[in-house]
Amino acid sequence: MVGVNFFGDFDLASLAIWSFWAFLAYLIYYLQTENMREGYPLENDDGKLSPNQGPFPVPSPKTFDLADGRKIVVPSVENEEAHRRTDLALERTSVNEGYPFRPTGNPMLDGVGPASWVPRRDEPEVDAHGHNKIQPMRKTEMKVSAGRDPRGMPVQAGDTEVVGKIVDMWVDIPEQLVRYLEVELNSGKKKLLPMTMLKIWSDRVRVNAITSDLFDTIPDIKSPDVVTKLEEDKISAYVAGGYMYAKGVKPYAL
C-alpha cells in the first residue's frame, strides 16, 4: 500500500488539503493583481496618490494585442491619462475624503454627477467583421416584425410637452435590437434617444427623464449615419442625468 510502504506515516490527506489552500491563495493573489491593471495606483479625491494602496502590489506592465490591431500596455501612465477627465466643474463639500462633490455649473452640460461620461475612443463600435455595430434602420435591410413601430410618432417630454417626432430607429445589428430612436425636434435638429430611457405607447413616445427645454442640448453626433463610443456615452449620460437634474417632470399622462 502506497501510504505505508512509500510514504511511511506521511498524511496524504493533509498534503492534499494544504496543497489546495496554497493553490487557492495563489489564485486569489493572481486574480486580484490582474484586476489592478487599470485604475491603479489608488488616488484621493484630489487626484493625489492615496497613502493606503492596499495589501496587493500593482502588477508589472503587460502588452495586450487587440482585435483591431492596436496594442495596449497596462498598467501605464499613458493608458490612465487616456481615460482621465480634468477641469471638472465640481467643488468639494468637505475637506475630508469620501464626501460628495457639488456641481459648480450646469451638471448635465458639464457631464458630472449622474450625467458623468467617460472619455471613450471617438470611433464607432464594430462587430467581428469590422462593420459598425449600430446603424440607422434606413441603412439596413431590417424591419419591425413585431410590436409597435415608433417611426412617425410624436415625442412627449417629461413635462408632457411634444418636442418632435421619431424619424428612425438605430439598430444593434449583431444583437438584433434597437439601441436608439432618432427624433427630429420642432427646431429641426435631430437627436438620438437611448431606447432604455423611453417608453413607446400606442400614440406617442414618452421620455420621462428630461423636460422639453433640455432636448436641444442633447449631445450631437458628427455623422448622420454613425455614432461613436464617445458620443454614445455622452448621450446616455446626458439623458440619464435628467432623472436627477431635470425640473418640472410630471407623471405619465394617460
UniProtKB/Swiss-Prot annotation:
User: How does the UniProt record describe the way this protein sits in the membrane?
Assistant: Single-pass membrane protein
GO biological process terms on file:
photosynthesis, light reaction
- What are the names of the required cofactors? a bacteriochlorophyll; a bacteriopheophytin; Fe cation; Mg(2+)
Classification of source organism: Bacteria, Pseudomonadati, Pseudomonadota, Alphaproteobacteria, Rhodobacterales
The UniProt keyword set, sorted, is: Bacteriochlorophyll, Chlorophyll, Chromophore, Electron transport, Membrane, Photosynthesis, Reaction center, Transmembrane, Transmembrane helix, Transport
Q: Which gene encodes it?
A: puhA
Where does this one sit in the cell? Cellular chromatophore membrane
UniProt remark on cofactor binding: Binds 4 bacteriochlorophylls per trimer. Binds 2 bacteriopheophytins per trimer.
Q: Where are the transmembrane segments?
A: 12-31
Write down the NCBIfam families for this protein, in alphabetical order.
puhA (TIGR01150)
Functional description taken from the UniProt entry: The reaction center is a membrane-bound complex that mediates the initial photochemical event in the electron transfer process of photosynthesis.
Q: Which family does it belong to?
A: Belongs to the reaction center PuhA family.
GO CC terms:
plasma membrane light-harvesting complex; plasma membrane-derived chromatophore membrane
Q: Where is the signal peptide?
A: none
Write down the InterPro entries for this protein, in alphabetical order.
Bac_photo_RC_H_C, Photo_RC_H, Photo_RC_H_N, Photo_RC_H_N_sf, PRC-brl_dom, PRC_barrel-like_sf
Protein's organism = Rhodobacter capsulatus (Rhodopseudomonas capsulata)
What does the record give under GO molecular function? bacteriochlorophyll binding; electron transporter, transferring electrons within the cyclic electron transport pathway of photosynthesis activity
Q: What is this protein called?
A: Reaction center protein H chain
Give the quaternary structure. Answer: Heterotrimer composed of subunits L, M, and H.
